């Protein structure tokens, strides 16, 4: 028999290479807070259902709280432990603290429903933080929209000057995009916020568990009724990663514009020294590292989304060890989007916009062509004829090196 918690039917010790290959403690230790929260409510339920005594419940509950404090204080090195994962790590610490009583913690529970619970609690906590950071960004963009309502700039299609727009309208466009992202995140929360605990490995438990009480105690809207579904799907992880990818796409596009605008060729925006870096060789350089890194990290988030989708696509019901591979991508996605949202708002607030130059550019380059076309339409000219006529005038103005207004007034 091995010394593993599940080792009763095994005659050989686990190969050291397999033990290392199988372990996830080095990265899933970030779930310790959620794991302890879930375990504390679980033992309260066991006492409520008379499976544990109140004294046993209190002993386990208090020891778990001590373990939480010790982990937060950095008393343990997760890279030097033999336990497979954070769940077994905490259970072993519990047994070391309170002896055989600690062995009762896992009564009526599998790691399958335990990890599913931890992930839902973790993504819920982080989702709330992402939502808060999105709200700050939306407020920042709203402020910029109001501040620059009257500041004209060239609008672009195909990165070519198209029509004049307000700089405020530009920021409002991104405000709308991030507002939809916020709505998507809140929709995800409604689907995710259900408890899997009590589903066991896949078929529940013969013990008289009160799943609804546990769900309510942990702040869930209810339980996942089908136990197979509760432990076997990671659609809530995939959906959060998908929302994160959408947010990163919008951040990347915003950053791309600001990178272009900060070049000498555009000169629409000046980077604050506190949010720019220099060159190790060229003393003249002022580099937009913040938006470049955000733009680059978007690809990283996309990659994690595709990886998790690919992991899940061929798995039979219910739980499979492949699903351990959801965590590193999820954790990195969450950490990446949080740091990007934390950086983008103060970065935007630090920028200085060259609004006089933007206005000058908006009033040159034949950006008034569409307005002139539509004025001809209002006078009764067919649209296609008006389009052809204004195009001919533009060609003539380019040849004469004058504006459309100058050409038309001269005519």
Swiss-Prot record:
Belongs to the lyase 1 family. Argininosuccinate lyase subfamily. Pathway: Amino-acid biosynthesis; L-arginine biosynthesis; L-arginine from L-ornithine and carbamoyl phosphate: step 3/3. Pfam families: ASL_C2, Lyase_1. Its main location: cytoplasm. Signal peptide: none annotated. InterPro entries: Arg_succ_lyase_C (IPR029419), Argininosuccinate_lyase (IPR009049), Fumarase/histidase_N (IPR024083), Fumarate_lyase_CS (IPR020557), Fumarate_lyase_fam (IPR000362), Fumarate_lyase_N (IPR022761), L-Aspartase-like (IPR008948). Keywords: Amino-acid biosynthesis, Arginine biosynthesis, Cytoplasm, Lyase. The keyword Cytoplasm applies. It comes from the Bacteria. One of its GO terms (biological process) is arginine biosynthetic process via ornithine. It catalyses: 2-(N(omega)-L-arginino)succinate = fumarate + L-arginine. Its EC number is 4.3.2.1. GO terms for cellular component: cytosol. This is Argininosuccinate lyase.
């Amino acid at each position: 028999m091995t010394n593993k918690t599940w080792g009763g039917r095994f005659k050989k010790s686990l190969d050291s290479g397999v033990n290392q290959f199988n372990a996830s403690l080095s990265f899933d230790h970030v779930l310790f807070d959620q794991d302890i929260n879930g375990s504390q409510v679980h033992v309260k339920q066991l006492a409520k259902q008379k499976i544990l005594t109140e004294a046993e419940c209190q002993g386990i509950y208090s020891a778990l709280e001590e373990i939480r404090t010790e982990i937060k204080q950095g008393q343990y090195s997760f890279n030097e432990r033999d336990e497979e994962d954070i769940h077994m790590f905490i259970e072993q610490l519990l047994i070391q603290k309170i002896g055989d009583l600690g062995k009762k913690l896992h009564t009526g529970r599998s790691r399958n429903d335990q990890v599913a619970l931890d992930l839902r609690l973790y993504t819920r906590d982080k989702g709330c933080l992402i939502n808060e950071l999105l709200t700050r960004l939306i407020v920042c963009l709203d402020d910029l929209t109001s501040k620059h309502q009257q500041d004209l700039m060239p609008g672009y299609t195909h990165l070519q000057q198209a029509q004049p727009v307000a700089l405020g309208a530009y920021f409002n466009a991104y405000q709308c995009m991030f507002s939809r992202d916020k709505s998507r995140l809140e929709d995800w929360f409604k689907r995710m916020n259900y408890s899997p605990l009590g589903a066991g490995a896949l078929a529940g438990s013969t013990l008289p568990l009160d799943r609804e009480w546990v769900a309510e105690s942990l702040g869930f809207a209810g339980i996942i009724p089908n136990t197979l579904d509760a432990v076997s799907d990671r659609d809530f992880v995939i959906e959060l990663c998908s929302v994160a990818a959408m947010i990163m796409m919008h951040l990347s596009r915003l950053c791309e514009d600001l990178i272009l605008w900060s070049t000498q060729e555009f000169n629409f925006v000046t980077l604050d020294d506190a949010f720019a870096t220099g060159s190790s060789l060229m003393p003249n350089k002022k580099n937009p590292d913040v938006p470049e890194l955000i733009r680059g990290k978007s690809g990283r988030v996309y990659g994690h989304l595709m990886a998790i989708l690919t992991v899940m696509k061929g798995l039979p019901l219910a739980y499979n060890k492949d699903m351990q591979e959801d965590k590193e991508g999820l954790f990195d996605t969450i950490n990446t989007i949080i740091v990007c949202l934390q950086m983008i708002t103060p970065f935007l607030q630090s920028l200085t916009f060259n609004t006089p130059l933007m206005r000058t550019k908006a009033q040159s380059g034949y950006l008034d062509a569409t307005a002139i076309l539509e004025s001809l339409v209002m006078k009764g000219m067919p649209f296609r004829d008006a389009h052809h006529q204004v195009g001919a005038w533009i060609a003539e103005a380019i040849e004469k090196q004058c504006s459309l207004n100058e050409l038309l007034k001269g005519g």
